[in-house]
Amino acid sequence: MEHSGTSEVTGADTAGPDPQLAVTMGFTGFGKKARTFDLEAMFEQTRRTAVERSRKTLEAREKEEEMNREKELRKQIEDMEPAPSSSSAARERSQSSCRDTSSSDSESDDSSDSSDDELIGPPLPPKMVGESVTTVDEGTLGPLPPPLCEEGEDDDDDELDDEGEEDNPVQRIPDSHEITLRHGTKTVSALGLDPSGARLVTGGYDYDVKFWDFAGMDASFKAFRSLQPCECHQIKSLQYSNTGDMILVVSGSSQAKVIDRDGFEVMECIKGDQYIVDMANTKGHTAMLHTDSWHPKIKGEFMTCSNDATVRLWEVENPKKQKSVFKPRTMQGKKVIPTTCTYSRDGNLVAAACQNGSIQIWDRNLTVHPKFHYKQAHDPGTDTSCVAFSYDGNVLASRGGDDTLKLWDVRQFNKPLFSASDLPTLFPMTDCCFSPDDKLIVTGTSVQRGCGSGKLVFLERRTFQRVYEIHITDASVVRCLWHPKLNQIMVGTGNGLAKVYYDPNKSQRGAKLCVVKTQRKAKQAETLTQDYIITPHALPMFREPRQRSTRKQLEKDRLDPLKSHKPEPPVAGPGRGGRVGTHGGTLSSYIVKNIALDKTDDSNPREAILRHAKAAEDNPYWVSPAYSKTQPKTMFAQVESDDEESKNEPEWKKRKI
């Protein structure tokens, strides 16, 4: 069989139908020629289509690059020329926006024509588009079309607003609205917010931990759960894990606890042996805890620091022993107590601030010697309340007990970058944190009672100048937290309040979910009263008593000894009816009657003896018969006076007066 120049695929032979086969099978159609496909033509058509699409794409890119060059050139010319009046500048800006809009429309038309085959008619040629643009440039007398000009002006205003917000980070602070959550009457010393921003947990000096659900709360702002996980110990720190399913609780005890989202205990760290000198050989802390921190990358690992001069790493799966121990030391090698600790953003560094004013940073895998050690970061003898890493991980902020806030570069840890003073603090857990964009640093100030109001101070990271302040309440600001997803600020105060600051336009969810809900009305208690059937003509035995007042019913019940449970009066006289009489009826009365009686003998012993003198004289039996012959007459010794006895005594026995 011969083939043509083009390759063809045939489905059957080209011979005609066989009549004998058709008669045998009962139907015709055998031997028809199958459809042929020209593969080379199909490949050629596909190649041409691809080349055409590539050419249009390149032309669109060239047009876009040309427009960008024209914009840059126009901008340079405007910068070189003197500034025109406001009206002409606005007009030129509107005309340029119109040109940009028309050019973008033409490009969109070209792209739509290339992609959509159902559109009828070709797009406008470039010459006509250029003429329309030229007429718009030359016709400065008439107004421009309203829709294009308004949209362009709005876009320019939005761009200017965005540029202003980027230049001034103060405008991003969400403080236009606030809500107040009443925790109690004592200091709110701990705040925690889960990563999604759905639940807030607060702890205070009143030993209580309260859970707040923004989605479930209404305008009454009441906590849905309250508990005391550490009994009679003040809550010092609360922190959600990175997954949000566990909460780390640190109190004044030596054992940290982990609870779940509903407040049920998951694990409790073991207490170490306080009689061992080397704290690295104990299985847990032996003194009061200060603060805690979850590992940012590893699930189930957290860190605690204590008054036993150690920083310990733990795992939730192994509560019987710590994972590793860091022992802060002074430059002389002596023990020093860490007051706060934290992980870096990548979890590779462990930072701790100590009571001698030093800040020590270890590599997480090397527990012996610190990687960085600055010995005079803050005044010795003060408690550094917080250390926090920035979101980029290069800067460390420390809130000292010497009323200062300092900024450090971890890459050059030899001196502070900036230092801000006049920030009083009275609590060992005063916070500091970074804004979500890393451009601001936030901390709170403390005040004495009745001596002013606590403030939330915002400092710019580049210059460390105070750029903004918020007066919170007539008490100290202890805790502060700026959530990056919600863009809301949570503050814990010294008078038992937890405040949430937000902006409806800049914030997401959180407090915005509960402020729009109306407060639920209290449900009235439903009481079922007995239905009375009034039948005035019924017999007295079938009549129901009428309902009386409560006072009269109580008086009647009082007279009934069974309903009033009146005690039985005491039995007078001998007992009756199975009851023993009052006299001698109890054990105490029996003892008083028979044993504790007054048995004093008032008789005269001389008279009792002389009562038998006559009988003894008439009938002597014991002594008198022995002296009847030798001494028939009784003779008694003579009584000597005391003076005679004293005279007969020797001189050395006489009493000296």
Swiss-Prot record:
Keywords of this entry: Acetylation, Isopeptide bond, Phosphoprotein, Repeat, Ubl conjugation, WD repeat
Gly residues compositional bias, start-end? 574-584
Composition skew (Acidic residues), residue ranges: 106-119, 150-168
Mark out the compositionally biased spans (Low complexity): 82-105
**In the record, which positions carry Phosphoserine?**
624, 641
On this chain, the residues bearing N6-acetyllysine are 455
- From the UniProt entry, list the residue stretches annotated as the region Disordered: 1-21, 43-172, 543-584, 634-657
| Numbered residues of crosslink Glycyl lysine isopeptide (Lys-Gly) (interchain with G-Cter in SUMO2) | 299, 593, 599
Where are the annotated WD repeats, by residue? Answer: 183-222, 230-271, 284-324, 333-372, 379-418, 424-469, 472-511
Q: Phosphothreonine: which positions carry it?
A: 582
Annotated Basic and acidic residues bias: 45-78, 543-568, 647-657
* Family recorded in the similarity comment: Belongs to the WD repeat GAD-1 family.
Identify the PANTHER family for this entry. Answer: GASTRULATION DEFECTIVE PROTEIN 1-RELATED, WD REPEAT-CONTAINING PROTEIN 70
Name assigned to this protein = WD repeat-containing protein 70
Which organism does this record belong to?
Answer: Mus musculus (Mouse)
Lineage, opening ranks: Eukaryota, Metazoa, Chordata, Craniata, Vertebrata
